[in-house]
């Protein structure tokens, strides 16, 4: 999985996109996402952060044994998976107008996107604790490093969208500009739906 992602990130057009589609399965992609999601949320707990749905409190019987509310984490994980399936369905409905493509392949592309979106969060969270430690001794440099990480994260989100476009093009061979417009609309639309959902349950 690590080799597939490395090739996709650094050599997407030549071999990366085709390699990850041919060598990874839905199971391997889901397993990788589960691993990095778990690590990310463990890091969030260690640095004292909150998950996206932290205001939604629904007591579970297991909470008294683990010392925190588990429901926001379950909701966060479930929402990411459902969004991934929803994006795959939108891609399937759209691209089957022009060409025949299996839903399972588009689900793989959507899961790849989901995995990629977790990586910048992992890097940021992994470095957040050292930055907090540095802030005690040098607030200026700590803030400068943190702002740099935010900038890199913003750039990485754009590059991840580009990789999503490359994967869809390699799979469907539909017009690149059309795919780019579709991806922008879908990602912005999904983000807006997430925000509406968060506001409605908070």
Report each predicted region and the residues it spans.
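Membrane-interface interhelical loops and short amphipathic "cap" helices
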Residues: 52-70, 132-142, 198-202
